[in-house]
């Protein structure tokens, strides 16, 4: 096949091979051919395992809390008081600066109808935004489909979560920003060179233009990643490294709408104070550094962080100084676009559902506000209905 006889069939075949190859790379390496629109980013943090909301946002003024947890309750003297009889776990102290600036929001009693205490089932519900468990598409995957950009979001981690699964494809997962570069397999680079050197019109010309744009954008992003210098000192932890990668992607101009990462495990059936205290401290230290980094880069106004867990824990401690799977829990959000404060009432520890805090705020309402108010997307289409949120955005 010479440079002069590259017909439409050959061109499309090469394009398909190239697209398949690039789709296996980190998401932003191929997103220039699609336009996501907007310049704001939502960072989603998954607290895997079922974080105990009562020891995160502590109802320290409620005697029932201490009666139910004689061994694992956070002492009143240690609570970081916020108001409404609630306060943060002491390990969250690095976030007090954001609270004082009105840039940290807590959402109380968040859950969904007919709660499921299975990790797998409940996480799937949060990932798909479908309590009926009928959907196989993630809510972030549906964002990708709505805006027509299969590279509008990435997961920073290892396995791609269901939240980032679209109908016909999975959005990319990046295990480490340090560990990649654009490398086309043997033969594919020659195919690209041949494809881009031929003269053509119509559909083939459009694909050529898109490919050139993609490669140009890829080179620019890679150069920016190489130039990135953290604007804050990050703690030495895996999660802090993930948040640093998130900051690097944002600062490098990837234009992605959603970046997703996880921390865990919060499945604290035994020895909860040791494990949860450590994880909350790891989260808080990393988020403080991340936000300081964004401020230094001049990007703080463009980023909001939202955190969730698949369920909370039971009110009463168990015999192993831990807690078992529960129902309602807390969500959090931080950033300049956040309406700081506590959204929702303090949990009712007298009126329980089989020993669990009763959910009062559907998590889809929290999602909806992020989709509509921050990303300027049609939440109704993405979530399959209208859901009222707690008002956590400015």
State the predicted function of each range.
Residues 300:
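Conserved H-loop
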Residues 1-297, 316, 330-394:
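Feature for exported/extracytoplasmic and membrane-associated proteins, marking the mature portion
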Residues 303-311:
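Acidic/histidine-rich, metal-coordinating catalytic segments
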Residues 312-316, 321-330:
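A post-motif C-terminal structural segment
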């Amino acid at each position: 096949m010479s440079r002069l006889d590259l017909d439409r069939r050959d061109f499309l075949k090469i394009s398909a091979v190239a697209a398949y190859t690039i789709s296996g790379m980190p998401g932003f390496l191929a997103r220039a051919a699609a336009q996501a629109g907007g310049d704001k980013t939502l960072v989603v943090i998954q607290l895997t395992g079922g974080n105990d909301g009562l020891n995160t946002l502590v109802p320290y003024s409620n005697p029932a809390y201490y009666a139910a947890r004689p061994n694992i309750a956070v002492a009143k003297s240690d609570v970081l008081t916020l108001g409404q009889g609630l306060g943060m776990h002491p390990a969250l102290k690095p976030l007090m600066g954001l609270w004082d600036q009105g840039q940290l929001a807590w959402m109380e009693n968040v859950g969904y109808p007919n709660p499921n205490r299975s990790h797998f089932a409940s996480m799937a519900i949060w990932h798909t935004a479908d309590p009926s468990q009928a959907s196989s598409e993630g809510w972030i995957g549906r964002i990708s489909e709505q805006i027509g950009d299969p590279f509008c979001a990435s997961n920073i981690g290892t396995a791609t979560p269901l939240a980032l699964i679209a109908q016909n494809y999975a959005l990319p997962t990046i295990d480490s920003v340090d560990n990649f570069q654009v490398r086309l397999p043997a033969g594919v680079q020659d195919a690209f060179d041949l494809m881009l050197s031929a003269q053509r019109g119509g559909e083939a010309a459009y694909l050529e233009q898109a490919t050139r744009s993609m490669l140009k954008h890829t080179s620019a992003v890679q150069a920016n990643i190489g130039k990135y210098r953290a604007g804050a000192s990050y703690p030495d932890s895996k999660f802090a490294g993930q948040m640093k990668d998130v900051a690097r992607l944002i600062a490098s101009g990837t234009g992605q709408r959603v970046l997703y990462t996880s921390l865990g495990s919060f499945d604290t059936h035994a020895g909860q104070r040791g494990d949860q205290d450590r994880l909350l401290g790891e989260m808080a230290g990393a988020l403080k550094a991340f936000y300081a980094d964004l401020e230094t880069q001049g990007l703080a106004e463009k980023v909001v962080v939202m955190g969730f867990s698949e369920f909370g824990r039971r009110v009463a401690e168990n015999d192993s100084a831990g807690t078992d799977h529960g129902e309602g829990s807390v969500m959090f959000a931080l950033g300049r676009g956040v309406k700081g404060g506590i959204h929702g009432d303090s949990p009712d520890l007298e009126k329980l559902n089989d020993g669990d805090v009763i959910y009062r705020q559907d998590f889809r309402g929290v999602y909806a506000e992020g989709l509509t108010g921050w990303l300027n997307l049609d939440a109704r289409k993405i979530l399959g209905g209208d859901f009222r949120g707690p008002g956590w955005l400015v």
